[in-house]
């Protein structure tokens, strides 16, 4: 798999389109950190770490809905393996005039765009969520 974050975002997007309550994805530290930000910002209910029958780590994600509609309306990958996107703290864009969130991988960890601005740190813009 060339893009594990992109794969996870696609699984979430597809599961919400089908109305699923949970979705599982192979586990990794970076994926868990991205899910931490999504949970902190209120886009998912949470996630649980487990292992499959072969002993590989798995993340079981609990999706969130409001009045039957998915909370996540748009989920876009920004920085891709073929084209990395790095931005300084002043260049990190606001998503939909501040209604959405950019998830940024910084030297201080993976965080939302608002946290990156408050910590005065830039980094790789992984994805945007609205």
UniProtKB/Swiss-Prot annotation:
One family name in Pfam for this protein: Ribosomal_S8
| Gene3D superfamilies associated with the record | 3.30.1370.30, 3.30.1490.10
Q: Which GO terms describe its cellular component?
A: ribonucleoprotein complex; ribosome
Write out the entry's keywords from A to Z: Ribonucleoprotein, Ribosomal protein, RNA-binding, rRNA-binding
Keyword Coiled coil in record: no
Which biological process terms from the Gene Ontology are attached to this UniProt entry?
translation
Query: What InterPro entries does this protein's entry cite?
Result: Ribosomal_uS8, Ribosomal_uS8_CS, Ribosomal_uS8_sf
One example GO MF annotation: rRNA binding
Name the HAMAP family for this protein: Ribosomal_uS8_B (MF_01302_B)
What family does this chain come from, according to its entry? Belongs to the universal ribosomal protein uS8 family.
Q: How does it assemble?
A: Part of the 30S ribosomal subunit. Contacts proteins S5 and S12.
Annotated function: One of the primary rRNA binding proteins, it binds directly to 16S rRNA central domain where it helps coordinate assembly of the platform of the 30S subunit.
The protein, known as: Small ribosomal subunit protein uS8
**Native organism:** Ruegeria pomeroyi (strain ATCC 700808 / DSM 15171 / DSS-3)
